[in-house]
C-alpha cells in the first residue's frame, strides 16, 4: 500500500472571530478521479490533505512514511511548497514529489525546471486528472515515472466530484470551527486569449461542460456544508445563458432556504448581454450580493 499526501495550502482568513480556509478543490479533483479505479483505491491510501500553510518542520515530522506527495502549486503557496518538498526529500529520499498547478504550468522552460528544483521527481502540466492517475499506476507497478506529463485534455467532464464522493469529509469533520470557502466549476476552457490572462493553461481552447445535474448537486452540497463563500471558477460564467441562469436560480433558492452561500463570486462572459445582466440582477436582488458582480472586461 502506497502512502499518499496531497498538498494545496490556500489563503487563511478571519470573519467574526472565526478562521476560514479555502477547500483544496484542485487537489481533491485529482484524488476523486484517480480513486474511482479499483486498482488505485486498493493500493493507494490517502493519508492526509494538507490545506494549511503549516510550519515546515512540524509538517515533515508528522508525515508517516510518505511514498508520494503531490503539490498543487499557485503563486501564493509556491515558496512554501518548494521548501516542504525539499525537506521531505531530505528526510524521505525515496518519496516521490509531484508538482502541478498553474505555477508549474507557467514555467517557461520545463527542462530547466529540474536543474533548479532537483527534489521534484515529476511535473504535471495543464489538466492533472489523467497524468496523476498514470503516475500513481506507474508507482504501484514499480515502473519509472516520466519527468514531465503533458496529457491532452479530458474528452468529457463526466468525472467524479470531490465534493460528492466524500474527499473532503475528513478535513471538514476534523476542523469543526473552520469557515470553508468552496470552488465550483460548471465548465472548463476559454475561447479567448487575453494578453493578461492564462486560465489554468486552457485559454484559447474549446469550452467543455460539466454535467448539469452534477453542478446542481455540488451547489446543494455547498449549502448543506455551510460554504460561506463560493467562487465560480469558470473563465466566462454566463456564456451558456439558459444553463447558467438555472444555476443562479438554484443558488438563490439555496441561500434563502439554508443561508448559504452568503457570497458568490464569478468572472463573467466577455460579451455582456441583457440576458447576462438578468442573471446578475437575479442574484443581487436575492441578497447573495457581496461578491457576485460582473467582471466582463477582456482585452
What is the meaning of each model-derived region?
Residues 1-224:
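Acidic, low-complexity intrinsically disordered segments
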Residues 22, 163-299:
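Radical SAM [4Fe-4S] cluster-binding motif and immediate context
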Amino acid at each position: 500500500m502506497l502512502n499518499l499526501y496531497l498538498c494545496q495550502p490556500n489563503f487563511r482568513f478571519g470573519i467574526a472571530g472565526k478562521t476560514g480556509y479555502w477547500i483544496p478543490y484542485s487537489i481533491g479533483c485529482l484524488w476523486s478521479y484517480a480513486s474511482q479505479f479499483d486498482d488505485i483505491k486498493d493500493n493507494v491510501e490517502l493519508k492526509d490533505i494538507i490545506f494549511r500553510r503549516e510550519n515546515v518542520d512540524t509538517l515533515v515530522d508528522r508525515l508517516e512514511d510518505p511514498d508520494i506527495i503531490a503539490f498543487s502549486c499557485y503563486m501564493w503557496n509556491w515558496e512554501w511548497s518548494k521548501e516542504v518538498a525539499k525537506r521531505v526529500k531530505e528526510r524521505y529520499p525515496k518519496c516521490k514529489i509531484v508538482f502541478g498547478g498553474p505555477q508549474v504550468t507557467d514555467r517557461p522552460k520545463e527542462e530547466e525546471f529540474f536543474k533548479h528544483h532537483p527534489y521534484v521527481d515529476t511535473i504535471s502540466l495543464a489538466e492533472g486528472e489523467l497524468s496523476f492517475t498514470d503516475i500513481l499506476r506507474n508507482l504501484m507497478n514499480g515502473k519509472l515515472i516520466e519527468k514531465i506529463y503533458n496529457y491532452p485534455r479530458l474528452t468529457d467532464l463526466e468525472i467524479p466530484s470531490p465534493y460528492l464522493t466524500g474527499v473532503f469529509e475528513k478535513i471538514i469533520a476534523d476542523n469543526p470551527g473552520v469557515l470553508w470557502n468552496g470552488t465550483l466549476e460548471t465548465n472548463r476552457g476559454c475561447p479567448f486569449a487575453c494578453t493578461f490572462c492564462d486560465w489554468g493553461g486552457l485559454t484559447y481552447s474549446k469550452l467543455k461542460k460539466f454535467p448539469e445535474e452534477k453542478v446542481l448537486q455540488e451547489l446543494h452540497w455547498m449549502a448543506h456544508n455551510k460554504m460561506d463563500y463560493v467562487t465560480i471558477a469558470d473563465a466566462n460564467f454566463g456564456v451558456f445563458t439558459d444553463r447558467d441562469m438555472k444555476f443562479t436560480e438554484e443558488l438563490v433558492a439555496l441561500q434563502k432556504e439554508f443561508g448559504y452561500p452568503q457570497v458568490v463570486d464569478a468572472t463573467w462572459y466577455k460579451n455582456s448581454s441583457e440576458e447576462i445582466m438578468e442573471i446578475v440582477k437575479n442574484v443581487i436582488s436575492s441578497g447573495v450580493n457581496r461578491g457576485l458582480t460582473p467582471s466582463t472586461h477582456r482585452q
